[in-house]
């Protein structure tokens, strides 16, 4: 498959505990040593336990089996950003991909290069209510801190590749 080539739909399942399963119909566009790259152009379908719709902005997603995060480049004109979903390592499924969200999200806001870790409240609630184990909570915290540092330094080649693929998806 060549870079940017659109393939048939791949369903990405994002499990939020206890919120249920969210899904996104995306397209695999590339696979390399960094992982599997998915694209969701404007109009791509998504669903949640109590809602559904289509993407209003383009996204590019990078996943890799065994790595406890999924990166989302979000082409929102008001706040173009890279969000990293800290998660249990993604798994390939018959329909595409699946991961369990561990709530913490390191985010790089491209406009001002600000990096923050979002959703500490959701993390505390999930851990406090027993929706994630102590091991999962530790994985979430350490992975979020490590990913935030990667975003601050900006040296990893996959960071610029994601922005490039996002620009191509417009």
Model-based region annotation:
Residues 1-56:
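Charge-rich, low-complexity N-terminal segments
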Residues 26-28, 59-60, 103-107:
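Hydrophobic/aromatic beta-strand elements that line small-molecule binding cavities or substrate pockets
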Residues 39-40, 72, 85, 118:
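Beta-strand residues in well-ordered beta-sheet regions across diverse protein folds
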Residues 47-97:
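The feature represents the first ordered module of a protein
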Residues 77-130:
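Conserved, surface-exposed functional patches that form binding/active-site neighborhoods
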Residues 92, 136-138, 155, 159-160:
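Juxtamembrane/interface motifs at transmembrane-helix termini
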Residues 121-148:
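Short, surface-exposed, low-complexity cationic segments
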Residues 143-170:
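Cysteine/selenocysteine-centered motifs that mediate thiol-based redox chemistry or coordinate metal-sulfur cofactors
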């Amino acid at each position: 498959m060549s870079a940017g080539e659109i393939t048939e739909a791949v369903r990405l399942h994002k499990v939020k505990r206890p919120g249920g399963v969210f899904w996104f119909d995306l397209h695999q566009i590339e696979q390399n040593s960094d992982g599997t790259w998915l694209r969701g152009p404007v109009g791509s379908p998504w669903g949640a336990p109590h809602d559904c719709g289509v993407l209003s902005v383009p996204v590019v997603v990078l996943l890799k089996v065994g790595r406890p995060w999924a990166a989302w480049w979000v082409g929102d004109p008001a706040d173009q950003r890279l969000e990293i979903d800290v998660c249990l390592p993604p798994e390939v499924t018959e329909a595409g991909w699946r991961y369990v969200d561990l709530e913490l999200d390191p985010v790089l806001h491209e406009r001002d290069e600000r990096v923050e870790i979002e959703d500490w409240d959701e993390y505390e609630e999930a851990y406090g209510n027993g929706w994630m184990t102590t091991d999962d909570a530790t994985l979430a915290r350490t992975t979020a801190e490590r990913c935030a540092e990667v975003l601050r330094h900006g040296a990893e080649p996959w960071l610029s590749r994601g922005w490039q693929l996002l620009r191509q998806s417009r």
